[in-house]
Amino acid sequence: MSDNSQKKVIVGMSGGVDSSVSAYLLQQQGYQVAGLFMKNWEEDDDEEYCSAATDLADAQAVCDKLGMELHTVNFAAEYWDNVFELFLAEYKAGRTPNPDILCNKEIKFKAFLEFAAEDLGADYIATGHYVRRQDVDGKSRLLRGLDGNKDQSYFLYTLSHEQIAQSLFPVGELEKPEVRRIAEQLDLVTAKKKDSTGICFIGERKFRDFLGRYLPAQPGPIMTVDGQLVGKHQGLMYHTLGQRKGLGIGGTKEGGDDPWYVVDKDLDSNTLLVAQGHEHPRLMSVGLVAQQLHWVDRQPVTAPFRCVVKTRYRQQDIPCTVTPLDDERVDVRFDDPVAAVTPGQSAVFYQGEICLGGGIIEQRYPLTIPA
């Protein structure tokens, strides 16, 4: 028998292919494996209900096929209190939050971890995230997933080394096509299911309609950086820096046919500022200040250091220098200007394959425009 035969792992089963294959891989490694389906949202229309019901049915079908038990739990109250209300408050303040990061912090690696350990007697939890864990000198590190296209460490930077030590990430060592191939070989119902792209647990729905249910939209003007009125927006909360689609405005004589991009939001006047060209100076930043810091090793940063940073998911690594301002904030200076650095989003730091941690972008340092 393997050393793992006495260890119980609870896999967060989403009804997707990654968690399905994770469960199978853990069985192959000799663990005692069971699944947990988390219900984190109280559906309020038929379409949402059907989507959630399909995910649960798929998770159950996979567990039946693999001969393992599936537990269910309702974390809707925790999700509302600890993720959704903060998400709405950030939008209301004109920032663009990342709910997946909050959800991982508060639900998957807190509520789920506690429930699995205390109620189900788990030694570990496991998820279908594309990240890797490395244990060095008694501390667990978070590494990027092997598949660079799918690496999800950006979403998990808030985890501590203690949380990582209680977590397993079986597909983090694989590339996505291999995961699908395993699912097809096993004839799992999730083998060809497309990856979800919706907001965390809120699923695939029209974001504008969804946000409009909870926050009153305030239409206002769309102005160019030169002060020209070019259109009307339906609410600042529907727009984010660097956004190109959905503005409903064409080119101008001076700017030619270059597409328009959102370069700023003026909350005081409820104005959306736009400029033409994806590298317009108003869109570029030379650095940022990050707050609400989380370092994976939980050691505060006391001296400047060099690393790379990502200011959004799947962005290329940006070489930078990080300087602590105090225990809660760091100053980050990029080697070269970066487009669309967005307050409310996360800045996540890496050294090589290791995810060091990150923080919320509080402000950006704009590229100064020559007079």
UniProtKB/Swiss-Prot annotation:
Q: Where is this region: Interaction with target base in tRNA?
A: 98-100
Q: What's an example GO cellular component term for this entry?
A: cytoplasm
Q: Which Pfam families match?
A: tRNA_Me_trans, tRNA_Me_trans_C, tRNA_Me_trans_M
Taxonomy, superkingdom:
Bacteria
Binding residues for ATP: G12, M13, S14, G15, G16, V17, D18, S19, M38, G128
- Chain intervals for the UniProt region annotation (Interaction with tRNA): 150-152, 312-313
User: Which residues bear the site annotation Interaction with tRNA?
Assistant: H129, Q345
| SUPFAM superfamilies the record matches | Adenine nucleotide alpha hydrolases-like (SSF52402)
Active site annotation, chain numbering: C103, C200
Q: Name one GO molecular function term.
A: ATP binding
EC number from the UniProt entry: 2.8.1.13
Purpose of the protein: Catalyzes the 2-thiolation of uridine at the wobble position (U34) of tRNA(Lys), tRNA(Glu) and tRNA(Gln), leading to the formation of s(2)U34, the first step of tRNA-mnm(5)s(2)U34 synthesis. Sulfur is provided by IscS, via a sulfur-relay system. Binds ATP and its substrate tRNAs.
Q: What is this protein called?
A: tRNA-specific 2-thiouridylase MnmA
* Species this chain originates from: Yersinia pseudotuberculosis serotype O:1b (strain IP 31758)
